[in-house]
Amino acid sequence: QSRSSAASDVYKRQETTSFSWMIFSIAVIAAIATASHAIIHKRDPRSATIWLLAVALVPLGGSLCYLLFGINRVNRKAMRLRAARPAKSELSNLGSAGRDLPPHLASLARLGGTVSGKELLPGNRCTPLFGGTEAYPQMLQAICEAKHSIALASYIFEGKGIGALFVDTLAQARSRGVSVKVLIDDAYARLSNSDAYGALRLHGIDVALFNPPVIPARLHGLHLRNHRKLLIVDGYRGFTGGMNIHRPYWCPKAPESAFRDLHLEVSGPVVGQMRETFERDWYDSKEEELDESFWTGKSGGPITDGCSLARGIESGPDETLDRMRWIFIGAINAAQKKVCIRTPYFLPDQPTIAALGAAALRGVRVEIVVPQNSDHPFVQWASKAHYWQIIEHGVCIYAVSYTHLTLPTIYSV
């Protein structure tokens, strides 16, 4: 019996050792595969470094987290749609728009075209709308005047207050026979008890949630959110900018406490680029393709004769994350007179800090305007840690009383 017991113990130890070596081998292989993928595919060196450290410290756990959260599958789906449906021609047959620009602006225009893959289009009208008191009435009026289609995308769409008015107005448009499609990011809709998703569905409106992580197949996209704010009416009248459909932007009884952000009312050929962006987001959410008949029907839409050059530049989970950074740094480098940035959250990376400092050193007046009291104190503390890096080169930083405003402005002439 003692020999049998000893043999059994030896067998168990060997089995345990074999299992341990198997787990170790799997962890090593997973770590090598994860590290290789991160090095090859991560564009941001800081992101790649963080993932490498995570895999080195916790091989299996780090690899599993990378598999779930480190691979951008939304990008792959969008690329498949772009390959199947190449960019459509704009609303009119337009030639090159940047021919008569000064050299430094022509260079910026070429940069924008290269990184965005979209044409710089003439003939647009862009009307700035400051705050909800200006933007929301114009948006609601456009919805009331819709004859054929409404496409609305918002990261936050509250169902109370101003959001309830939007829901009612959209429902009235649908009752008139207007085709209405609404896209809301799933994250806020799931975290908030006041989202508009349920109310929109009760009115029979076609509404989709972007990238719901509760679906097992989309668990990997928990961190991939859609922050776009788009309203496109009848295919030719658009609104876009920084405002969600959110109560903090609408405080008629206490306007001084309202978030002050910028929205644009846009008409002209560039609305076609806004349409393509919504089409891709809608396809990613519902796998439904929107054709030209959805936007304008048989009658088509008018093309305005505005005087603004415009280009739609996308930034989101299905796009290259460096795109807006390249445009932003290119605009700072093209500035000749003044750069003014108004932002609630000033957390620049090192290339942006270098561009701002270089602009100030070559004589451009650089102003950063931030809120005196941020709605996110921790972000404000982190922001202040960067101030010295640009102040020492002559950049001016002003703290004002507003709560929330995003408005970069570049003066070149």
Model-derived regions: residue spans:
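Short, contiguous acidic/charged loop-to-helix segments that flank catalytic cores in large enzymes
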Residues: 319, 344-347, 373-381, 397, ...
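Helical hairpin unit composed of two closely spaced alpha helices linked by a short loop
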Residues: 345-364
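C-terminal structural cap/anchor segments
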Residues: 378-405, 412
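N-terminal localization/anchoring segments of enzymes in phospholipid and broader phosphate metabolism
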Residues: 5-326, 330, 334, 358, ...
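Single conserved hydrophobic/aromatic residue that forms the stacking wall/gate
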Residues: 1-11, 404-413
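Structured, soluble regulatory/oligomerization domains located on the cytosolic or IMS-facing side
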Residues: 150, 336-339, 365
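Structured cytosolic domains appended to multi-pass membrane proteins
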Residues: 352, 358-359, 374-375, 379, ...
